[in-house]
Amino acid sequence: MMKRELKKIRLKYELDDTIVIPQVDSKNIRLPGLEEFVIERGKALRVYRGMANRLADSGWVKIGEENLTLKDITSMRWLESSEEVLIKLPEFFYLKAVKLIGEGKDSKIMEVQNDLQEIIDIRLRKLIKLVFLKEAPANILERLQPEEKLLYSFLKEALKIWQKELMSPDGG
């Protein structure tokens, strides 16, 4: 179940709109599931992120959104470790961080991976504390990434069932 739900989050990320800036003069492009359209150099347009990545790989466009950098990840690690509560991370943070690792230079990949793992560990400890609250504050839950919301719901439900089973005279 968890794996399937994580795949849905990845799909949502790929189907999210993003802005691209064409780097070529007029070209007719036909993308799967869409009508043919014309791209013109410098004229921004919105496409699905998955398509934007393919167009960028071909050199036809540059993606308009800013990618995460090593500096971003390092500062988020520092902030996360210095705050008692979860910090607000950029939307789809984990998927963007993994993309950075995939595109990274060998010398920096290990540093990004270590910082990302530390962010995950710190946030997981904070998330587990939330699971034990009767009701977590809405403003804190809003700071969870989609993958973390999934884990929070799963753990909360598992704990609820476990407690119910323990307290039931017939085991459920």
Stretches with model-predicted labels:
Residues S26-T69:
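Compact, well-ordered interaction domains used in eukaryotic information-processing assemblies
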